[in-house]
Amino acid sequence: MSDLLSVFLHLLLLFKLVAPVTFRHHRYDDLVRTLYKVQNECPGITRVYSIGRSVEGRHLYVLEFSDHPGIHEPLEPEVKYVGNMHGNEALGRELMLQLSEFLCEEFRNRNQRIVQLIQDTRIHILPSMNPDGYEVAAAQGPNKPGYLVGRNNANGVDLNRNFPDLNTYIYYNEKYGGPNHHLPLPDNWKSQVEPETRAVIRWMHSFNFVLSANLHGGAVVANYPYDKSFEHRVRGVRRTASTPTPDDKLFQKLAKVYSYAHGWMFQGWNCGDYFPDGITNGASWYSLSKGMQDFNYLHTNCFEITLELSCDKFPPEEELQREWLGNREALIQFLEQVHQGIKGMVLDENYNNLANAVISVSGINHDVTSGDHGDYFRLLLPGIYTVSATAPGYDPETVTVTVGPAEPTLVNFHLKRSIPQVSPVRRAPSRRHGVRAKVQPQARKKEMEMRQLQRGPA
């Protein structure tokens, strides 16, 4: 009898581990169990890892999908989804759990589209960036009067207003000249941000992310950078001046891909507001400083948009299945957008990888860099481009590239070491005919002239 009971309990445990994700709200412990359940179902293509802890000590868990989990494969792009940045905006969290189960199940069912996506892409899913805030919101539940309860982290900070402000620097550089990518962090940045923000920034430093989406609630629209308005003039009710990035057309296309694959976002009229094509420039909607999507673009190689996915910030459980069906195709199509533009390796004469080489596209004032393995990824719309690769100590290389509408174009660069140019010593004629007087080097000459100016006329 005890043997039968043991077998029954084992089968019950096994059933709990492989049961599909249900359409309900998952508290922190449920979320963790769900992530490990998916890993148990698909151990060959998944990995659960933590990028840090929240203020109250909860792990910020990520579920990775890859045919080689835990390993970066050169020329395979990295893409991420971030959910539940605002603790009371719960739909993104649940969609990420449903997406995780869907990818696992469809891979096991040999759905060729999903198999190819996982073989060609390294996908990172962070269901909850703000688990502390979620627990506060979940304790209140949906349809309660506290609209903003649980929005912030445990220290009362809005995490989407907590990243270092790099927009101020890029707007200055665009006007007066300066770097157009990978803007440095302030020296004291760690003391200015919350633990959750710090963890995400370190996560960005650990992976060469190419594409990302940040899932929110309270509206239905695909929002693209910049979020912070360059001009603070108001152009209508709740509207400020549009502030496009150098990649504005590309960002619009990424936003439209999600909007038109979504069940109803593309219609424009949602939640009492109207957005043509279901998309908006962030600053055109309202100006937001220290946001995450602008930070991605200005500090890393990553192109991120913000997805507002539901009128209700914390929708009732009976709406979750409808929301999943409305977002499923859009979530997959957006992941597939990482496979466009150009990609390749940057190598030296001996075929060694060159990290941190700068890839520039003529006419687009935003560069990207090669990763630690020497591979780079540059999202571009179809067209003909002039592309250059540069690295300190090497001669630049420039090529003309045709980008098609489907797969990315492979463009490798082989950079040769620069040969130092030695300037010949210039000599001036002496005042005496036929005799040349030796002159000082240029730096010494300038120094003597400066001293003469300081002394004044003799």
UniProtKB/Swiss-Prot annotation:
Residues 423-458 are annotated as: Disordered. Its cofactor is Zn(2+). It is linked to Carboxypeptidase N deficiency: An autosomal recessive disorder characterized by angioedema, acute or chronic urticaria, and hay fever or asthma. Affected individuals have levels of carboxypeptidase N below the reference range. The gene is CPN1. It comes from Homo sapiens. Disulfide bonds join 42-104, 271-311. Glycans are attached at residues 400, 402, 409. Keywords: Carboxypeptidase, Disease variant, Disulfide bond, Glycoprotein, Hydrolase, Metal-binding, Metalloprotease, Protease, Secreted, Signal, Zinc. This is Carboxypeptidase N catalytic chain. One of its GO terms (cellular component) is extracellular space. Zn(2+) binds at residues 86, 89, 216. Pfam families: CarboxypepD_reg, Peptidase_M14.
